[in-house]
Amino acid sequence: AFVGCIQLGAWTPFTLLVFKSEFSYLHPAMYNFLFWSHLAMVVQAFVIHRYSDLRIRASALAVGWYLLNDVVDYFVPVVGTAHHTRLPAEPVVDGAVRHVAPAHEYAAAGAVVLTVVATFLVVATRAEKLRAELDATGEGSA
């Protein structure tokens, strides 16, 4: 959940900002709801870490899942074209979404960077939690 909250919680606001003019059809209340509710997911990740152990195996599985998701969504589609959420900047031609440049690349770059950031944060948060546990027991070094 930690990795997903960061990756998905930050990707939507990123996309809303990068393609702001394309999302202008949204009512301002809906735009703000989508933006802020997804950013709240990033905050939620740091609430989750308070009660989760962020075990290495579970963290590795989550990171692997989101990396696979990025690969399938943007680079190596399983069936047809890329599978990521359709962006208003990508036209539908003859019933099929055309993943045009640079919209597709911007969305892909955002997703991959956020997966890397989430990976760093899960590892760093786990390390800090372990350090705090060791310090609390007197086994850690300053």
Locations of regions flagged by a protein language model:
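Juxtamembrane "helix-exit" motif on the non-cytosolic side of transmembrane helices
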Residues: 13-24, 74-79
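Membrane-embedded alpha-helical segments of multi-pass membrane proteins
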Residues: 33-41, 113
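Alpha-helical transmembrane segments in multipass membrane proteins, preferentially the mid-helix core
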Residues: 39-56
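Membrane-interface capping segments at transmembrane-helix boundaries
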Residues: 121-139
